[in-house]
Amino acid sequence: MQRRKFLQQSVLASAGVLAGGSVVAAAAGSAGGLGAEFPVVRIAEAKRKFKSQAVEKIVREVRQNIGNKEIGWLFENCFPNTLDTTVDFELADGKPDTYVITGDIDAMWLRDSSAQVWPYLSLCKDDKDLQQLIRGVIHRQAKCILKDPYANAFYKDESKISEWKATDLTDMKPGIHERKWEIDSLCYPIRLGHGYWQITGDKSPFDEQWLAAMKTVLETFKTQQRKESDGPYSFQRKTSFATDSVPLRGYGYPTKKVGLIHSMFRPSDDATIYPFLIPSNLFALSSLRNLRTMLQALSIGKDLDGLAFALENDVNNALLEHAIVNHPIYGEVFAYEADGFGNHTFMDDANVPSLLALPYLQSPHYSGDLSVLHPEKRGYTVYQNTRRMLLSENNPFYFKGKAGEGIGGPHAGLNMIWPLSIIIRGLTSHDSQEVAFCLKLLQNSHAGKGFMHESFHKDDVNKFSRPWFAWANTLFGEFVLKTYKTQPALLS
C-alpha cells in the first residue's frame, strides 16, 4: 500500500477501531490512561519472531520494580516490539542475516532498522543470540548499500518490484522499495556498527563486504557535495503531494557548493526545501568520526581513512560557516536547512536526525567547536538556544493542544504530534521535571492501545496514525530504561 494513502486511512480508521469496542479501548480513560487492569496486548509468545533472554530479563525487572504500573505495562509491550514482530533472522552463506521491517510496512529502511535495534545494544554483550541478530542487521545493511546507496528502503526478496516503479522517475532496481536519497540512510549503519563494536568488541561483522559498503558511503557523500556536477541521482514522482517529489528535474533547488552534503529528502521521507539538511550533515560529521575511529582501531580500510578525514574536515568547516544563524529572539541557533546562499529555515521535524536529537546522535569522539555535548564549546550554547526555539510556538511544527504537545512535521500533517519527538526531548533533557513531563505525555498518548503510535492529534489521542510503528515503541523502551537506571524516582 502506498504510504501516503496508508497514513490517511490509518488516521481515519483509528477512531473507528476504538469505537468498535476493543478490550483496551473499553479500559481507556479520557486521556488514554487505564485503570487497575492492564489487558495483554503483547503478541503471544508462540508467535514472537525472536526471543532474547536479556531483553526478557530487563522487561521483568523494570515492570516489577517501578511504581507506575501503566508505564511498566507500556514498557513490557513496547521495548521488545521490534524483536516480537519485525525481525526475520536466518543464516545466509554462513553469515547471520537479519531483515527488519518497520511494522505495518513490509520493507526495511536503513534508518529504521538501525534505530529499532539500537536500544538493545546495551544488553547484547551477555546475550550471544542477540549479538548474532544485530550482526545480521549490519551484514544486510552492507548488502543494501552496495545494491543502491541512494535508496532508503529495501525488500527481502531481491527480485520484488516496488509499487513506486510506476510513478517514480529514478533508477529503480528490483528489490528496492523506495529510492529517496537521505543522508541519514548511510549514517545510521555506521552508528549501529560503531555502537555494536564498542559494546561487544566483536570485529566479525566488519569484513570485506562491509568495507566495500563503507567505501560506497564515502564516495556517495563526496559525490553529493556536488562540487563538480549534480551527480547521478535525481528523483521525481507523479503525485499530488508536493513533499513526495523533487523540483527542477529531480535535482532540487540551487545551492552554492560549500562542502555540505546535499539531501533530497528528510528522515521523514519528505522532500527538503533547501538541500543542505543541517541535522543530517551534523549526523554525517559524527558518522565520519565514528568510522575513522573504527578503521584506525581495527587496522582495516587504511585506504578509506584519508577520504573520510577529508570529508569530515570539509563538512565540519562548511557547517561552522553555514549551519549557525542568528534568530531575532533566540540568538545563535542551528538552521534546519540552508542553501549556501544565505537562505535557511527555522524549524524542526520529529523524525531523527533532528535538531532536537543532536545530543542523542552526536559522536562522543567529536570534540570540535560544533560539539553539543561539551559546555565549553560553541555548539553547546547554540544547541541550547535552538532547543528553546524548537520547543516553542516559534517552531512552525510544534503543536500544543488538549491531548499534549510536541513536534510533528509535514508528513502526517498539521496538528499531529509525533511521540518520537517527545521521547527524544526526554532522552536529551537534564531536567528531571522535563523528563517527568515527557513520560506523562507519552503515558497519556497511547489511546488505550498499549503502544506508541507514529503521531496523534494534539486535541485527541484517539486520532492517530500507524498503530504498528516499531521504531517509536523500541525508542520509548530506551527512554524508560534510561530513566529507570538514572532517575528511578520519576517512575514511582
Regions inferred by a protein language model and the residue ranges of each:
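Well-ordered alpha-helical scaffold segments within catalytic/enzyme domains
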Residues: 54-67, 115-128, 188-203, 282-301, ...
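Aromatic-rich carbohydrate-recognition surfaces in CAZymes
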Residues: 106-242, 469-484
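Low-complexity, Ser/Thr/Pro/Gly-enriched N-terminal "stalk/linker" regions
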Residues: 12-13, 31-111
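Hydrophobic core segments within long, regular secondary-structure runs in both alpha-
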Residues: 72-80, 117, 121, 131-145, ...
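Extended ligand-binding clefts on enzyme/binding-domain cores
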Residues: 110, 146-157, 171-174, 208, ...
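C-terminal capping/lid segments that line or modulate ligand- or cofactor-binding pockets
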Residues: 168-175, 179-182, 345-376, 414-492
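Twin-arginine (Tat) signal peptide motif
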Residues: 1-7
